């Protein structure tokens, strides 16, 4: 798979939804993990990230509690840390992975208990990643079979020996639409920025461009 320029890819995509990017720094000594959220409805757009230091993660919360209509599917922990393992997802499956791995189960075991989100007709995919202490990582997407709400398809991607200077990106959606088409194929391969600051800045810049 050819490497993409993640900035250009996201800038040209009107609505990728929620996205996860995992990369190995060019020096091979650090792993970068990024997560972003976008929303189309007022309820979806009414949220911000808040730290959860006691669990080594972050949660989403309403930017304006008075405007919160339905907390299901939009209020959750996108990031949690279990020992030296970092979990990032686009929904409450973060807690499922955390709980099941705490019991000795695997990333895949945990996600086999879950399915896509019940937001007909989009059936938003559940995207997840787990990054281990040795730098290896796994990603997953749980999605409907071309919009069939009675059929789940679970995909898992394993990166035991990531290459320095590159990463993988997955999002909930392929692009905007009605209904919104789910992401297709394996996570996209992209060139990693030089520093974590550049990595974070690039994702923030793209997110702000779509506001």
Question: Predicted segment positions?
Answer:
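Conserved short alpha-helical segments that host acidic/polar catalytic motifs at enzyme active sites
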Residues: 1-210
């Amino acid at each position: 798979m050819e490497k993409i320029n993640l900035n250009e890819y996201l800038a040209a995509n009107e609505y990728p939804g929620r996205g996860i990017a995992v990369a190995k720094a060019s020096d091979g000594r650090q792993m970068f993990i990024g997560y972003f959220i976008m929303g189309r409805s007022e309820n979806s757009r009414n949220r911000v990230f808040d730290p959860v230091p006691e669990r080594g993660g972050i949660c989403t919360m309403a930017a304006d509690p008075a405007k919160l209509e339905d907390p299901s599917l939009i209020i959750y922990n996108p990031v949690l840390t279990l020992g030296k393992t970092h979990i990032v997802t686009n929904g409450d499956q973060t807690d499922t992975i955390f709980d099941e791995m705490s019991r000795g189960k695997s990333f895949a075991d945990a996600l086999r208990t879950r399915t896509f989100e019940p937001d007909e007709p989009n059936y938003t995919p559940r995207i997840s990643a787990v990054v281990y202490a040795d730098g290896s990582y796994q990603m997953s997407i749980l999605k409907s079979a071309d919009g069939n709400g009675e059929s789940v398809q679970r995909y898992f991607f394993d990166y035991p020996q990531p290459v320095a200077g590159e990463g993988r990106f997955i999002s909930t959606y392929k692009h905007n639409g009605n209904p919104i088409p789910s992401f297709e194929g394996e996570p996209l391969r992209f060139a990693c920025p030089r520093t974590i600051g550049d990595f974070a800045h690039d994702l923030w810049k793209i997110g702000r461009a779509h506001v």
